[in-house]
């Protein structure tokens, strides 16, 4: 999936997909509320999304993702979940922080980084022998380091 779309485009697609899932329809008013922008700003953005064939929208009508828009939304959801899983399951961050940071990070990583992240998560989850031990050790080291303990001291224990 080509993620060459800018961050703002990606964020609009995610909001529209969320609104479609929640309300079955996406409206300019609802998008403006979620983005914290004016309706006219949303209208300008929607015309750009329509030019990219990511949405179908008629003036004063509902906004609908096209097949390409749905593919992009699905891919963004997968990226978001992968980053959130890393932050929560591996690094042990609180869900609220992981959610907030995943929203930012998902737009910045390259396809190569995403692939490497997916391979890493798969490996960590599939290793029946080391999975729990690895995660415990990572979290233990993270806690020790946050207290100012150098890694060398942690490793010698």
Regions found by a protein language model. Give the residues of each.
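Basic, amphipathic "hinge/linker" alpha-helix immediately C-terminal to the N-terminal HTH DNA-binding motif
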Residues: 61-80
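Glycine-centered, phosphate/nucleic-acid-interacting loop/turn motifs that mediate DNA/RNA or nucleotide
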Residues: 53
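Key DNA-contact positions within bacterial/archaeal DNA-binding proteins
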Residues: 40, 96
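N-terminal helix-turn-helix DNA-binding core of bacterial DNA-binding proteins
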Residues: 3-37
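C-terminal regulatory/oligomerization modules of transcriptional regulators
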Residues: 104-157
């Amino acid at each position: 999936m080509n993620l060459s779309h800018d961050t703002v485009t990606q964020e609009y697609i995610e909001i529209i997909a969320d609104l479609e899932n929640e309300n079955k329809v996406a409206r300019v008013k609802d998008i403006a509320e979620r983005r914290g922008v004016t309706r006219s700003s949303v209208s300008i953005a929607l015309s750009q999304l329509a030019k990219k064939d990511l949405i179908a929208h008629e003036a004063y009508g509902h906004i609908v993702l096209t097949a390409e828009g749905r593919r992009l939304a699905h891919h963004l959801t997968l990226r978001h979940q992968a980053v959130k899983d890393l932050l929560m399951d591996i690094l042990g961050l609180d869900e609220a922080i992981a959610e907030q940071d995943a929203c930012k990070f998902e737009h910045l990583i390259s396809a190569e980084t995403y692939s490497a992240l997916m391979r890493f998560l798969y490996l960590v989850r599939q290793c029946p022998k080391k999975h729990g031990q690895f995660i415990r050790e990572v979290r233990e080291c993270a806690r020790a380091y946050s207290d100012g303990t150098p890694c060398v001291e942690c490793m010698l224990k």
